[in-house]
Design a protein with these regions (language model features):
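Short beta-strand scaffold segments in enzyme catalytic cores
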Residues: 25-32
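Compact, glycine-rich, soluble single-domain proteins
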Residues: 42-56
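C-terminal binding/interaction regions
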Residues: 2-19, 70-132
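Active-site segments that bind and position negatively charged phosphate/pyrophosphate groups
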Residues: 22
């Protein structure tokens, strides 16, 4: 699957977002090495803390099906905003644990895209090693 196909699938997920408060729809597509993929959309709640972001939705779905970080090929996150989608702090922390450090992460909107990694997005990570 090429990058544009991933972006298109992620926009399909964004179209299913539940964002009545922010109207900021985000979608994600997590491609696995075996060719399967998982979609995620942001799901908002009147109690904002209960909102779940698109990238966490996709990664959690994959984990629910038994996939783990070594099974992932690429994560793609998109939005309809003026700037490319970028994971929030909570998502960066979650992705730092549930993705390999060098897993490509495609960030895009309708006009632009870039490829990064969680190591680049969150250089000083809090890990289980910090609790020892």
């Amino acid at each position: 699957m090429n990058q544009q196909q991933l972006i298109n699938l992620a926009f399909t997920a964004a179209d299913n977002a539940y964002a009545p408060y922010s109207n900021y729809k985000v979608g994600a597509c997590l491609l696995c090495k075996d060719g399967n993929y998982f979609l995620g959309a942001n799901i908002e709640n009147a109690s904002y803390g209960d909102t779940n972001c698109a990238e966490r939705s996709a990664v959690f779905a994959a984990y629910s099906y038994g996939y783990r970080k070594d099974d992932f090929d690429t994560l793609c996150i998109v939005c309809y905003g003026k700037t490319i989608a970028a994971p929030c702090g909570i998502c960066r922390q979650v992705l730092s644990e549930l993705l390999n450090q060098d897993t490509p992460i495609v960030l895009a909107n309708k006009e632009n895209s870039m490829v990064t990694t969680i190591a680049e997005l969150l250089p000083m990570q809090f890990t289980s090693e910090d609790m020892k």
